[in-house]
Structures are given as C-alpha cells and as structure tokens.
Design a protein with these regions (language model features):
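C-terminal beta-strand edge segments of enzyme domains
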Residues: 67-127
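Active-site beta-loop-alpha substructure in enzyme catalytic cores
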Residues: 1-58, 62-64
C-alpha cells in the first residue's frame, strides 16, 4: 500500500523471522515494513539481530512494535525498534513507552546505492 508517497508493507509477528517475507515486500516496492508482534522471552534475538538484518539486507525501514509485560505464564519482551536501511536502530526498552522515529527518504536512496542487494540478486541460481 502507498501512504504519503511511501510504499508500506505489513507482516505479523513471526513472519519477520523469515528473510523471504521482507524480501518479497521490498521487491513489491515497500520502503518500510510494519510488524506488530507479541514476541515472548527468551527471543530477544529477533529485535536485536533479525529485524536490523532484514532492514539492511532489503534496504528498507522495519518498524517492529512488540508487546511487553506479563500475561499468565508468558512474559513479552518489548524491545520495539525501528531499523533503518543502513543498520541504524532506535530501540525501546522492556516497559511500555512511545517510540518515535523519523524516516528519511534520502537515507533510503544513499543506502540503496551503497548496497544494491535487490539489483544484485541472482534468482536464476536459486529459484
């Protein structure tokens, strides 16, 4: 979907943990991928490692909004973040808080020129 000139993609929770989901959205024109989630402990590697990697390898912003707190026997990890196409990350903590990030279209262009992963793909080799 396009909003104010930005291509937006939407994934839900676990979907962001698969490289091909973000790649498909990037190839379809997404500039930013929005991910509402309720990820539990001990899966901190998702916001700390996978979300920034998905942003960088696809040259998009990824906004990962995770639930935090405890419900029954489950503790949700928080660590919501916005990862940029060059690896910069703004991160929230374990407690509820508002995370605000300004997305810079020129940063997308710079990053896409420096790391042309989408253009350098070789789908003929892997299907």
């Amino acid at each position: 979907v396009t909003w104010n000139g930005w291509g937006l993609g939407l994934l839900v929770c676990y979907d962001v943990e698969f490289p091909e989901t973000v790649r498909a959205l990037a190839l379809a024109g997404a500039d930013a991928v929005l991910v509402p989630t309720a990820n539990m402990l001990p899966y901190d590697h998702v916001p700390r490692v996978l979300v920034p990697a998905r942003a960088w390898e696809n040259q998009v912003y990824v906004a990962y909004a995770n639930w935090c707190g405890t419900e029954g026997s489950l503790t949700y990890g928080g660590l919501s973040c916005v990862a940029g196409p060059a690896g910069a990350v703004v991160r929230a903590g374990r407690d509820p808080e508002l995370l605000v990030a300004e997305l810079d279209r020129s940063a997308l262009a710079v990053s896409r020129r420096a790391n042309p992963y989408l253009a350098d793909r070789r789908p003929d080799l892997y299907g």
